[in-house]
């Protein structure tokens, strides 16, 4: 008999989860949803059920999502060629229209529908709604390999959060609604900007002084040099691991985003594997969690 078929084991699991449910009651938990989980229907359903259970447990979940592969697929379908500078996509006027259509349209509404199918009341938003987020143009620099001189890249309508107003999010929390937010926002200059979903989620979590910010990724978390999962890191520990090369490659910007979220007032940020079914519940409602927790 499996655990799920054993009533006594089910009761024990629920009982063990109770202290964690009480810890997060009435708290804000921001979940950045992306990676492999978004392309897998079963994982998508499991994620939606996790978010519904958080709400039913008295927690205020906020979902921020990405959608890079879906954006690229739509650009290809429409015959819009992508241009890159220093390995980064340039978002011109045509591209940002597609970005908004895909992120704030199809992907956003798919996630909303999945959560609503679990009996909750989710609402799809982007940074434009309720003047929630205003963006500013992002400035990226790279070192020219030939001249070794720092070069400023113009990536078009790629932005970063400049202002976050939590008024609408507080209203939705009081109304028992679950915000699902696409990382698209207006600038004070009147343009629409595409914002990195991790950065966007960190800004939202900081504005809410969230108890937890969860980044669902395609990896278990931060690994040590022996490829073992590190369960918890302070900001100082994380910075030291970047410096000595333990944290490298694509994990560096992810961890730096976590550190910035902590500086903005988030109590703890977790990098965890979104390919593990119900990883959100495992992280929040079990003793050992499911990823790497970064704390001040």
Curated annotation (Swiss-Prot):
GO terms of biological process kind: arginine biosynthetic process via ornithine; L-arginine biosynthetic process
Disulphide connectivity of cysteines: none
Gene3D superfamilies given in the database record: Acetylglutamate kinase-like
Keyword tags: Amino-acid biosynthesis, Arginine biosynthesis, ATP-binding, Cytoplasm, Kinase, Nucleotide-binding, Transferase
GO CC, one annotated term: cytoplasm
Keyword hit for Kinase: yes
Any one Pfam family match given in the protein's UniProt record, by short name: AA_kinase
Record field: catalytic activity: N-acetyl-L-glutamate + ATP = N-acetyl-L-glutamyl 5-phosphate + ADP
UniProt pathway: Amino-acid biosynthesis; L-arginine biosynthesis; N(2)-acetyl-L-ornithine from L-glutamate: step 2/4
Subcellular location: Cytoplasm
Binding site for substrate: 67-68, 89, 194
EC numbers for this chain: 2.7.2.8
Site positions (Transition state stabilizer): 32, 254
Gene Ontology terms for molecular function: acetylglutamate kinase activity; ATP binding
Superkingdom of the source species: Bacteria
Location (main, coarse): cytoplasm
Family per similarity comment: Belongs to the acetylglutamate kinase family. ArgB subfamily.
NCBIfam families (UniProt xref): argB (TIGR00761)
Function: Catalyzes the ATP-dependent phosphorylation of N-acetyl-L-glutamate.
PANTHER family cross-referenced by the UniProt entry: N-ACETYLGLUTAMATE SYNTHASE, N-ACETYLGLUTAMATE SYNTHASE, MITOCHONDRIAL
The name this protein goes by in its record: Acetylglutamate kinase
Protein species of origin: Brucella anthropi (strain ATCC 49188 / DSM 6882 / CCUG 24695 / JCM 21032 / LMG 3331 / NBRC 15819 / NCTC 12168 / Alc 37)
